[in-house]
Design a protein with these regions (language model features):
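Residue-level marker of structural boundaries
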Residues: 12-15, 67, 119, 178
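Glycine/small-residue-rich loop that forms an oxyanion/phosphate-binding "nest" at active or ligand-binding sites
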Residues: 90-96, 102, 106, 113-121
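Conserved AdoMet/S-adenosylmethionine-binding subsite of the radical SAM
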Residues: 108-264
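Phosphate-coordinating loops and pocket residues in cytosolic domains that bind phosphorylated ligands
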Residues: 8, 82, 193-196
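Auxiliary Fe-S-binding modules of radical SAM enzymes
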Residues: 6-17, 24-41, 210, 222-280
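Short, charged low-complexity linear segments at domain edges
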Residues: 25-45, 55-73, 253
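Cysteine-centered iron-sulfur cluster-binding motifs in ferredoxin-type domains/subunits
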Residues: 46-61, 73-96, 102, 134
């Protein structure tokens, strides 16, 4: 049996008893959400599990609840009726104004959940996708999870920024059937300004995936005023230069639908304005 240590999340989580587990030396993430019948997270019909915690601070982040590793309550004021007897209970809130982001799942429970839809995966070439946050922040746990998925006959996809130590990439290669890396900006200064981190390690990791001849689909989010203009062409040029075919690159349109989440979480809204991107 693996030794288990527990670390409290602190008062900010506002949920007594909510814990983050460590199995051996592997950090175990909380799950911010699960999505069944996902059709944009890899091939076929999939179940996507979203971990909580990300080392990047993208100004356009459309899932701000995924940045912190700790559990967070969100109160959607436009739904809240401010009941005097409010118990801060997501399950009993009559207007669904309360939502808890960050719940503990065991690997066995996640695999069991995914297997509920295995007939759909088998018919469509689908499977399980691990997204975030940033799954590689918890790469030891992610390895164990994907190994369990593979043992259960489930196809695995990893949705990642690739901002992780090279060791994480090497360890995940044998258990990951397909990679879905984001490539946010080609210019390093631009990348650092809008995400809080350099893209140098990301590029090295991406080149490692190409060298390993993995199946991948690179996602390029086009954010007006941030990563449009010359950076679109620069990203395409770089990806071609390292051997990634155009058919394996997808441009994603930017939306600012997440503004209500920032308000509900008590976070500063940093999302750029939604407008037409510049293309040179």
């Amino acid at each position: 049996m693996k030794r288990r240590e527990f670390i409290g999340l602190g008062a900010a989580a506002m949920l007594p008893g909510m814990l983050v587990a460590r199995e051996g030396r592997a950090k175990v993430p909380l799950m911010r959400d699960t999505k069944r019948f996902a059709i944009h997270d890899g091939p076929g019909v999939r179940t996507t599990f979203f971990v909580k915690g990300c080392p990047l601070k993208c100004v356009w982040c459309h899932n701000p609840e995924s940045i912190k590793s700790e559990a967070q309550w969100a109160r959607f004021q436009h739904l809240c009726q401010h009941h005097a007897t409010c118990t801060m209970d997501e399950a009993t809130c009559p207007t669904r104004a309360l939502k808890l982001y960050g719940k503990p799942w065991t690997i066995d429970a996640l695999v069991k959940k995914a297997l509920e839809d295995k007939p759909f995966y088998d018919r469509t070439g689908g499977g399980v996708t691990l997204s975030g946050g940033e799954p590689l922040k918890f790469w030891e746990w992610a390895y164990d999870f994907f190994a369990a998925c593979r043992a259960a006959g489930l196809h695995t996809c990893l949705d990642t920024s690739l901002y992780a130590p090279p060791l994480a990439i090497e360890k995940m290669l044998p258990v990951t059937d397909m990679w879905l890396p984001d490539y946010k900006a080609e210019d390093d200064a631009l990348h650092a300004r809008h995400t809080g981190v350099s893209n140098k390690i990301i590029k090295k990791n991406l080149e490692r995936l190409v060298a390993a001849k993995v199946k991948l689909e690179v996602r390029m989010l086009i954010v007006p005023g941030c990563t449009d203009g010359a950076d679109i062409r620069a990203r395409h040029d770089y990806l071609r230069s390292i051997g990634i075919a155009d058919k394996d690159v997808v441009e994603l349109e930017y939306f600012d639908y997440a503004r209500s989440k920032y308000l509900a979480l008590g976070m500063k809204d940093t999302m750029p304005e939604k407008k037409e991107p510049v293309r040179l």
